[in-house]
Design a protein with these regions (language model features):
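Glycine-rich loop at the start of a catalytic domain that most often binds anionic cofactors/ligands
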Residues: 44-45
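Structured surface interface patches that mediate subunit assembly and partner/cofactor docking
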Residues: 1-7, 11-14, 21-34, 54-75, ...
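Extended, alpha-helix-rich binding/interface surfaces that flank or overlap catalytic cores
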Residues: 41
């Protein structure tokens, strides 16, 4: 399996681990996504898993779910379990399994994928998906009170891709502006900070040469 699909696989497994602590009673809990509670975040993640599986298997994504974490991003998720707490949680594992199967069956990395009005490759779709799924795994973990960090190795490998695939001009409606953190912040916290989250236990770093 190519590295792009391995990264997506690991991100999905991390997010599932975080979601394993969700319960129907927790679905109204706040999340790092300002306008979304845990239930909406889980439904959104399910929609994203469906879109990624569609992109990798049939090479076309009709609708790209809007990410949480940025202004104007509070649109309602459309997943089939969006109104059913127990089904929302259990359905996430089913949707993840479909995506992981699609990852295992992609023959290469340069197959074209139609995403809205753009033409990307399966590699780009997989890496972009890994970044989003990993950060939402962190969002879910924080919402559940566990604060399980993005695994260090996974975050270290995703950070260079995030810098390339999430430039400032593409952030509106997807991610908030980067949060400055101390230089010695862990890779997992640097990843979520780059994607607009304030890691637990960190303070805003003063901007300057060689910042975060």
């Amino acid at each position: 399996m190519r590295i792009e699909y391995r990264l997506l696989d690991r991100a999905v497994r991390y997010a599932l681990s975080a979601a394993g602590h969700a319960t129907p009673r927790r679905l109204t809990a706040a999340t790092p996504c300002p306008e979304w509670d845990l239930g909406r975040l889980l439904a959104h993640l399910g929609d994203s898993l469906d879109a990624l599986a569609e992109g990798l298997s049939v090479r076309s994504v009709g609708l790209v779910p809007t990410c949480c974490g940025a202004e104007g991003s509070a649109g309602a998720p459309s997943g089939p379990e969006a109104g059913d707490g127990e089904g929302l949680i259990t359905g996430l594992a089913v949707r993840a399994a479909v995506l992981l199967t699609a990852c295992a069956e992609v023959p290469g990395g340069q197959e074209p994928v139609a995403v809205g009005d753009q033409l990307l490759t399966t590699s780009v779709v997989a890496i972009t998906g890994a970044i989003e799924v990993a950060v939402h795994g962190w969002d879910i973990s924080v919402s559940c009170g566990d604060h399980e960090p993005v695994p260090s190795r996974l975050a270290t490998e995703l950070l260079p891709y995030a810098a390339l695939l999430v430039p400032r001009h593409t952030r509106p409606g997807l991610f908030a502006d980067p949060v400055l953190v101390p230089r010695r912040t862990s890779a997992g916290d640097r990843l979520v900070a780059f994607l607009g989250r304030q890691p637990a236990g960190t303070k805003m770093a003063a901007p300057g040469p060689g910042g975060s």
